[in-house]
Amino acid sequence: ISAVPSHPAVAMIKYPNKIMERPRFPKDLEEAGYSTRYYYAGDIHFGSFRSLVTMSFQGMVTEDDFSGEAMANRFKWGVHDQYMFERLYEDIAKARQPFMYMAFNMSSHEPFNVPGEVAIPGDDTEHKFLNAIHYSDACIGEFIRKCKASGIWDNTLFILMADHGTRHIRHVDPSTPAAYHIPLILSGGAL
């Protein structure tokens, strides 16, 4: 959102006054006529997320905006991905153009307890992590399928990236740069 580099000892998001000094691309898009919204289906007060979101986006969707089955299946970090992506799709389908919506999915975060059948069996952390990644990937895939079927895909740029690397894969040493490689995928009909 604001190109703040990763710092090994300090989470910069906890210092809103520092973030305010940085450029924030959602504000630039707002000035260009875009509507902006942030989706964080968890506790928006965690880690000072609320201050970053409110100073950067016109609106937000948090776990407070979910009910029923989504909240009944809530986990440590908030609402699972399938519910967040369903809400995101519903909102995009009726959004005024142009828009920039950013969504933070959380089911791929520990403790890696995801709903549905286990696709990658195993009780150790690595297998639970891989199963959670499989679940999140399936939720993203369903979201993209809906966007393609409805035509939203045709004139939209989708950017997928991770918020951090992982220490949960056995063969990745957390002290090496490989542990911090994160994907950045640009896709969609707008390309």
Task: Give, region by region, the residue ranges found by the protein language model.
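Solvent-exposed soluble domains appended to multi-pass membrane proteins
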Residues: 1-191
